[in-house]
């Protein structure tokens, strides 16, 4: 039997900014039909990897493949029909309303010279309802709080209706209740609609509870990957973060729960 190949994958990637290399010879797959959480300390290459997989950045070496084709061979609009991206610190394009921002998620689906369609309207409405921002539809994005603005950007990605969604720190700026709302929504999209999701998450316990697959990075290298129950150990957390901890079962979800005990001595953390 032939082993299936993930729709989105990178092979032997060298990533960086100018002369600064973040990752070298990195090969990674985003497994189809999974909710993948990318974890690791600050500066380990999580966001850079996500930006490269979405074609927002070009690797210095190596290739990103989407549906069996080199991602650079696709037109930008075609990539946007297949991959939705929530970038970190996204900049609002001018003074527009929340509804106008969310509607931009429909642009990849609109043929040239075609007017706004019923399915576009329905997608925008559903996305705003799912993120709880319907009441903000006519408000300028510039007047929103950080959390409200983040939810508007997430709604735009949802309105794009792509089978693959990449989200860079989607819970940033959100209070705890909206963090859980968002993660529950993403988990539902994955379980019930088969969306392939990859998100950079800093909260390890949220990553373990909601993601079905983890990719753990340290210094631009994949240290471990797999289901949370299979890979999350006290040894792994200490190796990645230099943090001593206990791993217990989450009393609600049964997933690994990280209980911090304190920092490891620098010589141990860097070994």
Curated annotation (Swiss-Prot):
CDD domains: ABC_Iron-Siderophores_B12_Hemin. ATP binds at residues 40-47. GO terms for molecular function: ATP binding; ATP hydrolysis activity; ferric-enterobactin transmembrane transporter activity. SMART domains: AAA. Induction: Controlled in part by the amount of available iron. Induced 1.5-fold by hydroxyurea. It catalyses: Fe(III)-enterobactin(out) + ATP + H2O = Fe(III)-enterobactin(in) + ADP + phosphate + H(+). It is found in: Cell inner membrane. GO terms for biological process: ferric-enterobactin import into cell; iron import into cell. InterPro entries: AAA+_ATPase, ABC_transporter-like_ATP-bd, ABC_transporter-like_CS, P-loop_NTPase, Siderophore_ABC-ATPase. SUPFAM superfamilies: P-loop containing nucleoside triphosphate hydrolases. It holds the Pfam family ABC_tran. GO terms for cellular component: ATP-binding cassette (ABC) transporter complex, substrate-binding subunit-containing; membrane; plasma membrane. Its main location: membrane. Its EC number is 7.2.2.17. It is a peripheral membrane protein. Residues 8-244 form the ABC transporter domain. Keywords: ATP-binding, Cell inner membrane, Cell membrane, Ion transport, Iron, Iron transport, Membrane, Nucleotide-binding, Translocase, Transport. PANTHER family: FE(3+) DICITRATE TRANSPORT ATP-BINDING PROTEIN FECE-RELATED, IRON(3+)-HYDROXAMATE IMPORT ATP-BINDING PROTEIN FHUC. Part of the ABC transporter complex FepBDGC involved in ferric enterobactin uptake. Responsible for energy coupling to the transport system. The complex is composed of two ATP-binding proteins (FepC), two transmembrane proteins (FepD and FepG) and a solute-binding protein (FepB). Belongs to the ABC transporter superfamily. This is Ferric enterobactin transport ATP-binding protein FepC. The gene is fepC.
């Amino acid at each position: 039997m032939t082993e299936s190949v993930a729709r989105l994958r990178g092979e032997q990637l060298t990533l960086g900014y100018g002369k600064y290399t973040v990752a070298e010879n990195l090969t990674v797959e985003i497994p189809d039909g999974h909710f993948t959480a990318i974890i690791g300390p600050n500066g380990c290459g999580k966001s850079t990897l996500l930006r490269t997989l979405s074609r927002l950045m070009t690797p210095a070496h190596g290739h990103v493949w989407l549906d069996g084709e080199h991602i650079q061979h696709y037109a930008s609009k075609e990539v946007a029909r297949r991959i939705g991206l929530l970038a970190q610190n996204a900049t609002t394009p001018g003074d527009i309303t929340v509804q106008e921002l969310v509607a931009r998620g429909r642009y990849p689906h609109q043929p040239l010279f075609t007017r706004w369609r019923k399915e576009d309207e329905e997608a925008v409405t559903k996305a705003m309802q799912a993120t709880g921002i319907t009441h903000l539809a006519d408000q300028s994005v510039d007047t929103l709080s950080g959390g409200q603005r983040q939810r508007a950007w997430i709604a735009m990605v949802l309105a794009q209706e792509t089978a693959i969604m990449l989200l860079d720190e989607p819970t940033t700026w959100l209070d705890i209740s909206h963090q859980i709302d968002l993660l529950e929504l993403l988990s539902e999209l994955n379980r019930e609609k088969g969306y392939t999701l990859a998100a950079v998450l800093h909260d390890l316990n949220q990553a373990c509870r909601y993601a079905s697959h983890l990719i753990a990075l340290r210094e631009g290298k994949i240290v471990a990957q797999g289901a949370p129950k299979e890979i999350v150990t006290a040894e792994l957390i200490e190796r990645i973060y230099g943090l001593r901890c206990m791993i217990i079962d989450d009393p609600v979800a049964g997933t690994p729960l990280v209980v911090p005990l304190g920092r490891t001595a620098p010589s141990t953390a860097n070994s």
